[in-house]
């Protein structure tokens, strides 16, 4: 609900492509992971753009969550840095975009906690997709 309001204000459409999937883990952390991915996708989108939330299982049977946007994209030289705390791709627009620079760092740590992998695919002016792929079965229980 929070995301829908933010998306409306930014004139961004949210769509869902979901299939039933079970992701083992701490639901609060997974919720934060999804929220931070989606809010970044909205924040760095363009008016009239789209954010697509996906979940399902990949070809190997691993559960995944993906957030794709039609936003500004991330330059190749910036892509390795976006999961660092307080890192901002476009520092000149920091005040206009809002946020703390912690969203994707939270995503990274939530993914690591769940033994998940992160994949970022982006093209300037086209958009970005971030996919979080979870293990099929956890080796050890979550604390």
Language model feature labels by segment:
Residues 4-16:
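Short conserved segments within the C-terminal catalytic ATPase subdomain
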Residues 5, 72-73:
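Glycine-rich G1-box
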Residues 18, 22-25:
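Conserved micro-motifs of the catalytic ATP-binding
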Residues 41-42:
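Short helix-loop "hinge" at the ATP-lid/N-box region of the Bergerat-fold HATPase_c
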Residues 48-61:
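Short beta-strand/loop element within the Bergerat-fold HATPase_c
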Residues 74-88:
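Short conserved segment of the HATPase_c
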Residues 115-116:
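Conserved glycine-rich
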């Amino acid at each position: 609900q929070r995301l829908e309001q933010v998306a409306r204000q930014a004139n961004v459409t949210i769509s869902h492509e979901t299939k039933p999937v079970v992701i083992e883990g701490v639901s609060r952390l997974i919720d934060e992971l999804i929220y931070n991915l989606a809010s970044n996708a909205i924040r760095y989108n363009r008016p009239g753009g789209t954010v697509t939330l996906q979940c399902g299982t990949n070809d190997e049977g691993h559960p995944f969550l993906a957030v794709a946007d039609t936003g500004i994209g991330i330059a190749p030289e910036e892509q390795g840095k976006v999961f660092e705390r307080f890192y901002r791709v476009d520092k000149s627009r920091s005040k206009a975009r809002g946020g703390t620079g912690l969203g994707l760092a939270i995503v990274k740590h939530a993914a690591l906690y769940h033994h998940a992998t992160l994949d970022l695919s982006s093209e300037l002016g086209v958009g970005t997709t971030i996919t979080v792929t979870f293990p099929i079965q956890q080796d050890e229980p979550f604390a």
